[in-house]
C-alpha cells in the first residue's frame, strides 16, 4: 500500500462524533476526507434498490467493487453524495440504512470489496479517514490514530436530537437499545472488529464539546510535525 500523503484515522462507534470532528479537522488542515461509513451506507442503499439478497456474498463483493458513486461539492460548500446518478445525501442517513450497513460490514467479502476503494482516497496533501477500522485495517501505517468514543446513552441523545431536527418521531430508549446492539455486532464480528488501533489515542467525548475534541486531535497533529 502506497500512501500519497499523511493520514489521520478517526475510528469509533456510531454517534461518537467522528463525522463532525473529521470534517472540522480536514477543513482546518486543508486535507481530503474519507467518510467510510457512507460507503457502507451507499452499498446498503444499492442493495435495497436492486432487491438483492445479503446472502449472495460474491454478488455483494462485485457490487462493492464497482459501486457507481460520486462525491460532489455543492455551491454552498456541502458535499453531495450521488449513487447511480441520484443524490442520496439524506437517504443514506436513515436508521434503516444504517442498520443494514452495519450488517453488510460484518461480511468479509464486502469489506474486501471496499478496501482498495477506501485506500484510493489517500492523496496529497493528506487524508482524514473516519470509520471503524481505518487505523486497524485500511490505513495501519497512519501517522496519527484516534479512537473516539462516548457512552451509549450520550450517543443516543445526540442521535435523538438529529432525528428530531429532521421531524422524525423517535424513542430514546429504543435508540439506546439499537446502539448497544450495533456496538456488540461491530465489536464481535470476525473480521475487522471495532477496537482501538495499536498506539491510538483514545478520546471519550461523553463530557467534551466538539471543539475540545478537535483541539486535542489538532495538538496531536502538531506534535507529530504534520502542521
From Swiss-Prot:
It comes from Marinomonas sp. (strain MWYL1). ATP binds at residues 12-20. Belongs to the cytidylate kinase family. Type 1 subfamily. GO terms for cellular component: cytosol. InterPro entries: Cytidylate_kin (IPR003136), Cytidylate_kinase_dom (IPR011994), P-loop_NTPase (IPR027417). This is Cytidylate kinase. Its EC number is 2.7.4.25. PANTHER family: CYTIDYLATE KINASE, CYTIDYLATE KINASE/PANTOATE-BETA-ALANINE LIGASE. HAMAP family: Cytidyl_kinase_type1 (MF_00238). Its main location: cytoplasm. The lineage of its organism: Bacteria, Pseudomonadati, Pseudomonadota, Gammaproteobacteria, Oceanospirillales. Keywords: ATP-binding, Cytoplasm, Kinase, Nucleotide-binding, Transferase. Coiled coil: none annotated. GO terms for biological process: nucleobase-containing small molecule interconversion; pyrimidine nucleotide metabolic process. It catalyses: CMP + ATP = CDP + ADP; dCMP + ATP = dCDP + ADP. Pfam families: Cytidylate_kin (PF02224). GO terms for molecular function: ATP binding; CMP kinase activity; dCMP kinase activity. It is found in: Cytoplasm.
